[in-house]
């Protein structure tokens, strides 16, 4: 009786740990989905210089709250705080300081064992996604803290996306 109770209590951890490696194998090599190559983006956007010396400004505004950062007030209309990609609500995470219509969005859903988070680089002027980064994980609720945790295919997924965002259009 005790082992069954323990399994029922920890079922999401067991399922996430068992299923995630198979899902990781399915997604291996497919983490980055390219919609526009750097050359195509340059041609369509008219930007002929490198983005090497530009920065990505973190978007700190909470949905429904007025924006207070002068950078975001000045560039209002060049970005959208919320965008939908593949039916999922993505939140603005950063904006390029030189080309404020070039935005980064993220969708993180820790409420399902079969986690599939996405990060999108989007050109709001062209109304096109440049690329999408997929992060696969098995989410579960930590029994001690009650918070969401995961078994991720790539523990460095966020820094990998950040590096890709920084270097893709250089």
PLM regions: where:
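Mature extracytoplasmic/lumenal regions of exported proteins
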Residues: 46-170
